[in-house]
Amino acid sequence: MKKIMALVLAALMVLGCCSFAAAEDIPEEYPEIIEGLDFGGATVYINDWYSSGERAEEPTEEQQAQYDYWDWLEETYNVKLVEIKLGDWDGMVAELQNIVSNKDNSELRIIGVSGGFCGPVLANGLFSEWTYGLENFNKATVDFMTIGGKCYGVCGGKFFEPRQCVFFNKKVLEDAGIKWEEIYDAQADGSWTWEKMESYMDAVKADKDNDGELDIFALTGNFDDGVVGLVVSNNGDFYEKTEEGKLVYSADSDNTLAALNRIQEWNRNYYRPYVNWDDYKQFWPEGNVAFLIGQSYEGFNGNDVVNNVEEWGCVCLPKGPAADAYTSAADNNVFGIPAVYDEETSLKLQQIYTLYRKNPVIDADEDAWATRLYELTDERAVEETYAYLRENGTIMNFNYIGDRNSTIGPNLTWGIMGGAASEQVEAARLAMEDMAAVFNGDKTQEQVDAEKAEREAAAAAAAEAAAEEAAEEPAAE
């Protein structure tokens, strides 16, 4: 694979030094030219919250091949393409709202927002309908952005960025007499389940010095990843989406409740005790924890917490009893066309964005994405786990309302250990239903805030009355 990749890159770089004026000079990996698409020298901005607009001074072969392709796009379609930051991660919707409210079409823009902020975009009609080339993009994201049969945004390609997964420390498993290859085998034959993972976690826990305290722990990680991970791995969700596109609170469903009950058991029986949510970043490098439920970037980026142990592997979240396949809770960034352009201009922007997101190197070698990952871990983590999760993910419905730190986190998952799971789900109901009501258009945020203020005032008055009544009661003799 790597040899083929090198040949493709070399060919593209040679061609990149030449003019593409003649049709026969166009590399066969490049997409077919769209006749009549011409921007007349205009600049098209692809706005996000992280791009600098600059190219690498010393690009890799893959980067140079990408730059050559973008240069060809600019020459072919008479356009300047600039991918650059417009606002902060949590401010992109406000930037988009400002553009749409002012009907500002003075610049040609495609605007990106984090998947967790798409609710207001959809509810307020901030993106135009996207009709072009949907087959080129991740289907789950297209489905997520489809309301009433119309799609309003796409992501950056066909694949998911893998999220929740299970990392394991090979040495800890080996010291416990476990062959870590068995875990990959279980994943491969479909037997990697909650129960299977529990059997390994039971086997690794150890009190080495017989002082009554564990020295080797089974599990760590951001506990919220564990909560969300077990819910999605049991085919659960916190909201259901009706055929009409309405959200209905569903944390009390059998699948979700089973997952919440199970993660409570795991917290009590397997998680290394912690005080702060990010204590796992200190625990894992100590080399005394077998498993870490985290997000893929924590290992596969090469410079995060998982990389602090010498040898690690990675498998998908184990399946719950209601699941037929492995998955993770995906959160793809979404790009759309601000609802300020006429239909012809919107279509042109959809076309150039679709072309821009193609990568002839990746298209020529479908495994090119994996090249750098082999330096980090074993082949099975790359070829069996990461490769699978790139193509299999679940976009959970709370993303229509906001990211998990503004929706399910403060209202339910962060406090899930505060009592029985069913009680926590019921305690969160009013707040979670209010958020859905705003998204559904049944209430305004102002109405929700006013009702909340009334409830709080009534509760305060009742508490004050109870205190006064207690103070007036005669003291017991």
Where are these regions (language model features)?
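Conserved N-terminal structural module of periplasmic/extracytoplasmic solute-binding proteins
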Residues: A6, C18-F117, E344, D363-D367, ...
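Hydrophobic core
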Residues: L9, M13-C17
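Hinge/lid segment of periplasmic solute-binding proteins
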Residues: D25-V44, G87-V93, V113-Q164, E195
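Extracytoplasmic/periplasmic solute-binding protein
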Residues: Y45-D48, L108-I111, I147-F159, Q164-V166, ...
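Short, solvent-exposed loop/beta-turn-alpha elements that line the ligand-binding surface or hinge
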Residues: Y132-F137, Q187-D189, D237-A258, G320-T327
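Glycine-centered hinge/linker elements that transmit conformational signals in sensory
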Residues: E198-D202, F238-N276
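Extracytoplasmic/periplasmic substrate-recognition and gating elements
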Residues: D304-T371
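Long, aromatic- and glycine/proline-rich binding clefts that accommodate carbohydrate-like moieties
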Residues: A329, Q351-G419, A450-A459
